[in-house]
């Protein structure tokens, strides 16, 4: 596995900047179980970064719709979705190594074969590895909201990123986002509405009710009990 990732930030115009961050500084401590999963299952389910477009049929050994999840955390929801939808292929990207290890361990526990994972910067993967018009869905759940105003430019949801996602979706494919920070939800809605070629799937052109396809996380359920909100946005590529 690689030892460094390129972590995206954005300038005041929403254009991507690049800086190198090492896993050592970002990853935290691996548990024995996570390390064991990386040692045993990465050769089977892990995907190394490359600068050429990936052949999804070869990667998964079949022709099926591909769902890409950016930033899957510890992977619990991603593994659940893959288990519930064996007719789809899932590719998850996460830059934190403990999360990758935890996801691999969970995937093996439920014995799924339709999931692959990467440990690299999602922006670079999108630009270099994902073929145009190849994805049925892109999922971005609970990205860092960068609460402080002076840090808002670092949010991943900016017009250039949204346009990049659009180019990778098939016509009819969906970009699904979720956040528990209402100002970020409003920011997402504003950015998505500003980019031509998408259709908001909300009845009121704002937010959608959490679809059954997105599992309710323990953190989210606890937040709901405390009265915290979560906002889902789903936009379809129409051209």
UniProtKB/Swiss-Prot annotation:
Amino acids binding substrate: 148, 180, 217-220
Keyword annotations: Methyltransferase, S-adenosyl-L-methionine, Transferase, tRNA processing
Any one annotated GO CC term: tRNA methyltransferase complex
Catalysed transformations (reactions): guanosine(46) in tRNA + S-adenosyl-L-methionine = N(7)-methylguanosine(46) in tRNA + S-adenosyl-L-homocysteine
Pfam families reported in the protein's UniProt record: Methyltransf_4
Active site annotation, chain numbering: 144
UniProt-listed Gene3D superfamilies: Vaccinia Virus protein VP39
GO MF entry, a single one: tRNA (guanine(46)-N7)-methyltransferase activity
Enzyme superclass (EC): transferase
Organism superkingdom: Bacteria
Pathway: tRNA modification; N(7)-methylguanine-tRNA biosynthesis
Entry's family note: Belongs to the class I-like SAM-binding methyltransferase superfamily. TrmB family.
Task performed by this protein: Catalyzes the formation of N(7)-methylguanine at position 46 (m7G46) in tRNA.
Subunit-level organization: Monomer.
Classification via NCBIfam families: tRNA (guanosine(46)-N7)-methyltransferase TrmB
Protein name from the UniProt record: tRNA (guanine-N(7)-)-methyltransferase
């Amino acid at each position: 596995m690689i030892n460094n990732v390129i972590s995206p930030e954005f300038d005041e115009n929403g254009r991507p900047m690049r800086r190198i961050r090492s896993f050592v500084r970002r990853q935290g401590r691996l548990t024995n179980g996570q390390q064991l999963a990386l040692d045993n299952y990465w050769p089977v389910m892990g995907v190394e970064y490359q600068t050429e477009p990936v052949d999804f049929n070869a990667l998964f050994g079949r022709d099926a719709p591909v769902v890409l999840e950016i930033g899957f955390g510890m992977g619990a929801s991603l593994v659940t979705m893959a288990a519930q939808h064996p007719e789809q292929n899932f590719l998850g990207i996460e830059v934190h190594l403990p999360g990758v290890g935890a996801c691999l361990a969970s995937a093996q526990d439920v014995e799924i074969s339709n999931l692959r994972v990467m440990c690299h910067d999602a922006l670079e993967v999108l630009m270099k590895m994902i073929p145009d018009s190849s994805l049925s869905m892109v999922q971005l759940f609970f990205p860092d909201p960068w609460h402080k105003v002076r840090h808002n430019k670092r949010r991943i949801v900016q017009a250039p990123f949204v346009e990049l996602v659009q180019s990778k979706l098939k016509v009819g494919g969906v970009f699904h986002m979720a956040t528990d920070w209402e100002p970020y939800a409003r920011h997402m809605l504003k950015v998505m509405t500003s980019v031509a070629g998408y259709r908001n799937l909300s009845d009121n052109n704002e937010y959608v009710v959490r679809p059954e396809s997105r599992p309710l996380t323990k953190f989210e359920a606890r937040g709901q009990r405390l009265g915290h909100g979560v906002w889902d946005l789903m936009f379809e590529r129409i051209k």
